[in-house]
């Protein structure tokens, strides 16, 4: 009975709170024009409020049919073309004062070699933490949280089973004591029926 009472509010909370989540995520993904930010129109905390963007004509309609319901078609937002191209092309002569080395000797002099290459064998594994998002192929039972939960759940289950068996044995003994004990005197004794004749 208790799990059913707890299940109903949990389902209500999960199903009732679910529609609120997508609304917030849609609002967070609205696009802000980066050109407006670069031109300095808005400062920190002074960005336009999304709720104030709508016109007040939506609130003027009464819904009783008094006014004309036709709305003017709203134009689609214009696509802003970026001033800087979005490709990765870097011009060859980006800065006239810097010369790119082209000979093999110059390339070898400019090469940076790491002091110690990381190797997988023989390293100290004490500082390497296995993240759950990176351990894709690992077994679920290798994680300590899962093992601890399984052990605690098993202990609680075994204790519950032992107490249930003890309760059944106790009730059986109590029932057996009353039904087979013939040496006891009855609690109620029938009064003798003596008849007197006149």
UniProtKB/Swiss-Prot annotation:
Residue ranges annotated as Cytoplasmic topological domain: 171-198
Entry comment on modification after translation: Shedding is enhanced by a number of factors such as heparanase, thrombin or EGF. Also by stress and wound healing. PMA-mediated shedding is inhibited by TIMP3. O-glycosylated; contains both chondroitin sulfate and heparan sulfate. Ser-44, Ser-62 and Ser-64 can all be modified by either chondroitin sulfate or heparan sulfate, and the protein exists in forms that contain only chondroitin sulfate, only heparan sulfate and both chondroitin sulfate and heparan sulfate.
Gene Ontology BP term (one): inner ear receptor cell stereocilium organization
Transmembrane segments: 146-170
Start-end of Acidic residues biased regions: 48-71
Signal peptide: 1-23
Membrane-protein topology: Single-pass type I membrane protein
SMART domains, per database record: 4.1m (SM00294)
Renumbered residue ranges of the record's region Disordered: 42-76, 94-130
Keyword rRNA-binding set for record: no
Superkingdom of origin: Eukaryota
Molecular-function annotations in GO: fibronectin binding; identical protein binding; protein kinase C binding; thrombospondin receptor activity
Membrane side Extracellular: residue ranges: 24-145
One Pfam family it belongs to: Syndecan
Compartments, as annotated in UniProt: Membrane; Secreted
Residues modified by glycosylation: 44, 62, 64
Keywords: Glycoprotein, Heparan sulfate, Membrane, Proteoglycan, Secreted, Signal, Transmembrane, Transmembrane helix
Tissue-specific expression: Ubiquitous. Highest levels in liver, kidney and lung.
InterPro entries tied to this protein: Neurexin-like, Syndecan, Syndecan/Neurexin_dom, Syndecan_CS
Gene Ontology cellular component annotations, sorted alphabetically: cell surface; costamere; extracellular region; focal adhesion; Golgi lumen; membrane
Biased composition (Basic and acidic residues): 102-118
Quaternary state and interactors: Homodimer. Interacts with CDCP1 and SDCBP. Interacts (via its cytoplasmic domain) with GIPC (via its PDZ domain). Interacts (via its cytoplasmic domain) with NUDT16L1. Interacts with DNM2; this interaction is markedly enhanced at focal ahesion site upon induction of focal adhesions and stress-fiber formation.
Similarity annotation: Belongs to the syndecan proteoglycan family.
Function: Cell surface proteoglycan which regulates exosome biogenesis in concert with SDCBP and PDCD6IP.
Protein name according to UniProt: Syndecan-4
Annotated source species: Mus musculus
């Amino acid at each position: 009975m208790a799990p059913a009472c707890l299940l109903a509010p949990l389902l209500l909370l999960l199903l009732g709170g679910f529609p609120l989540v997508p609304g917030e995520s849609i609002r967070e993904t609205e696009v802000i024009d980066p050109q407006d930010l670069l031109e300095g129109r808005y400062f920190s905390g002074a960005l336009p409020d999304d709720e104030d963007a709508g016109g007040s004509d939506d609130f003027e309609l009464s819904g009783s049919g008094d006014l004309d319901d036709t709305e003017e078609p709203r134009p689609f937002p214009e696509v802003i073309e970026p001033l800087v191209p979005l490709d990765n092309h870097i011009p060859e002569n980006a800065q006239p004062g810097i010369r790119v080395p082209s000979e093999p000797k110059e390339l070898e002099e400019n090469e940076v070699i790491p002091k110690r290459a990381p190797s997988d064998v023989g390293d100290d594994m004490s500082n390497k933490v296995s993240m759950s998002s990176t351990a894709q192929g690992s077994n679920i039972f290798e994680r300590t949280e899962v093992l601890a939960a399984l052990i605690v759940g098993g202990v609680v289950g075994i204790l519950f089973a032992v107490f249930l068996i003890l309760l059944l044995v106790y009730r059986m003994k109590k029932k057996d004591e009353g039904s087979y004990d013939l040496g006891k005197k009855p609690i109620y004794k029938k009064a003798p029926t003596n008849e007197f004749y006149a």
